Amino acid sequence: MITVTEATATAGALQRLADQGVSVWLDDLSRRRIESGNLAELIRTKNVVGVTTNPSIFQAAIGSGEGYEEQLADLATRGVTVDEAVRMMTTADVRAAADVLRGVYDASGGRDGRVSIEVDPRLAHDTAATVAEARQLSWLVDRPNVMIKIPATKAGLPAITEVIGAGISVNVTLIFSLERYREVMDAYLAGLEKAQAAGIDLAGIHSVASFFVSRVDSEIDKRLSLLGTEEALGLRGRAALANARLAYEAYENVFAGDRFTALAGARANAQRPLWASTGVKDPAFRDTLYVEELVAPGTVNTMPEATLDAAADHGDVRGDTVTGGYAQARADLAAVERLGVSYDEVVEQLEQEGVAKFEAAWQELLAAVTKSLDSKGVDGE
């Protein structure tokens, strides 16, 4: 348990992030974290103003069984299917977390205090099913501060437009490439235009675009290490930051453009960039690298708890480390390409792997819940 005095001493870097316009979200959720008061404590002591979840997070939380036994027993008695059971458990957690964050949501005018829940990853390549699932999740959670996560696959793009057009706030996930990010922003603007035409108040619609960071370095650095030249080794740890910085440049251009300006006149909100996958995988780098080097106004950084703790303990927040660095970012990516590492190939591979990883985690979760339901005498099929 962190005391108030300890929190004051350790949260300095996190407060400096907030001062720079960066919203700190926690990339984790479990029933124990909610019921123990830990989430509320992180809000009080570590500047946490939002929560993101994904299939892997729920697989770890529910798969452990801790805190879910009573609900599992109830669901088994009712004879629900395994898919229904998983949805009831995950939406219950998100609803409870949304209630914990409601004060933040109200105080920020809806900008923060958000909890994200992802559509079934098995639907990543089915537009109509994704839209239907997003609507159902919004209805099931039934909280104004929920965000529905939709993957930025080709099929996900029109789904984003439809869901935003229905007035539902969206967290677009699994973005790796600059080209796809531009398509995501276009889908968001099209959704706002659709909502406006339907007479929906645009002020109530919020969105973030989750741009994945560390996975880009992991894959590109692996290829650079195989090359083994001095130039190649010197570029390790730079591609992901360059990619993210150029994404921020694209964000600035789009949301300063005429199309969004017209929507802003109707009280529309810009879709904020969210830095995801910010836990550092390579021990050769500072464990706060993707926090310190991606400080820019109007962004979100969602962190696993280990990264959050590291940032609070020894984070070095020096102000904006993104804007103005675009020329160097372009040079870094060009250097990687020149060495024969294909950016397009890497980001396409990462998108495919990202969808596959979430689907695999979801299948593991379904298997674990099926086993729990079966052990209580009810068929989970």
Curated annotation (Swiss-Prot):
Pathway: Carbohydrate degradation; pentose phosphate pathway; D-glyceraldehyde 3-phosphate and beta-D-fructose 6-phosphate from D-ribose 5-phosphate and D-xylulose 5-phosphate (non-oxidative stage): step 2/3. GO terms for molecular function: transaldolase activity. InterPro entries: Aldolase_TIM (IPR013785), TAL/FSA (IPR001585), Transaldolase_2 (IPR004732), Transaldolase_AS (IPR018225). It is found in: Cytoplasm. Gene3D superfamilies: Aldolase class I. Pfam families: TAL_FSA. Keywords: Cytoplasm, Pentose shunt, Schiff base, Transferase. It catalyses: D-sedoheptulose 7-phosphate + D-glyceraldehyde 3-phosphate = D-erythrose 4-phosphate + beta-D-fructose 6-phosphate. It comes from the Bacteria. Its EC number is 2.2.1.2. Belongs to the transaldolase family. Type 2 subfamily. NCBIfam families: PRK03343.1, tal_mycobact. This is Transaldolase 1. It comes from Streptomyces coelicolor (strain ATCC BAA-471 / A3(2) / M145).
